């Protein structure tokens, strides 16, 4: 009888130990669960009816989501969250001032993702690119023409975390990385190269029909485009930082010259919206090696 009671006691103890082990495992599992997504900061519409979304709101939402993934690939989770928050703050402030520009960034990003070898997708991307760059050029002009003092401008830049210091709020390198992703050399360079290759024949066939002054402008435009292509083609993976910086400054200077010469012929570059400048000032462009500059004949 005593042996039976002892056996029951041992069995009960084993059951308790098994139960405690299972509970501990469940606790560990609960701790390992990912934290729930933070609640959306978007204000819900009130009972009076749906709220009208301002221009660019949809573009902001999609852009924030895509950039959060971009930051997470660059940093660990804590830094990614911080970078995302800084980027979102800067873009929200930009969207309040220039909602159309934010919307164009999203259109450009979507078009870049769809661009392929077919003419339709390339024309769509080119159109979005031109509109976005036009907005950037307008913003730069407005800033130059504004009456802000140097001190006010410095404070504004610090508020966006884009000052030149090395503080934690400096988001300028991140914004530059975003621009490089949106305006990749693999997408932009082939289109520019194609125009330069078609330009000589176009100039030859329109020599007699164009006013001399306009013809000379087109000749100069072709020459500048070829110089830009040569800069792209001179890039190598072993270039030093000094060489890359010098090439970048040269490209920006050439792009400004290109803008001053006006629009390229629509037969070569496609239709352009009225009043739109062929402005590529703010881009950090570099071209892939391999394409020969010999086809760019300076006329």
From Swiss-Prot:
Main location class: cytoplasm
Modified residues (Cysteine methyl ester): 296
Tissues and organs where the protein is expressed, per its UniProt entry: Ubiquitously expressed. Isoform 1 is strongly predominant in all tissues except in utero where isoform 2 is the main form.
Propeptide part(s) removed at maturation, as residue ranges: 297-299
Membrane-topology descriptor: Lipid-anchor
GO biological process: chaperone-mediated protein folding; establishment of protein localization to peroxisome; negative regulation of lipid binding; peroxisome fission; peroxisome membrane biogenesis; peroxisome organization; protein import into peroxisome membrane; protein stabilization
Signal sequence, start to end: none
Keywords tagged on the record: Acetylation, Cytoplasm, Host-virus interaction, Lipoprotein, Membrane, Methylation, Peroxisome, Peroxisome biogenesis, Peroxisome biogenesis disorder, Phosphoprotein, Prenylation, Zellweger syndrome
Modified residues (Phosphoserine): 35, 54, 66
PTM-bearing positions, type N-acetylalanine: 2
Modified residues (Phosphothreonine): 236
Region (Disordered): 1-63
Function comment: Necessary for early peroxisomal biogenesis. Acts both as a cytosolic chaperone and as an import receptor for peroxisomal membrane proteins (PMPs). Binds and stabilizes newly synthesized PMPs in the cytoplasm by interacting with their hydrophobic membrane-spanning domains, and targets them to the peroxisome membrane by binding to the integral membrane protein PEX3. Excludes CDKN2A from the nucleus and prevents its interaction with MDM2, which results in active degradation of TP53.
Name used for this protein in its record: Peroxisomal biogenesis factor 19
The species this protein was found in: Homo sapiens (Human)
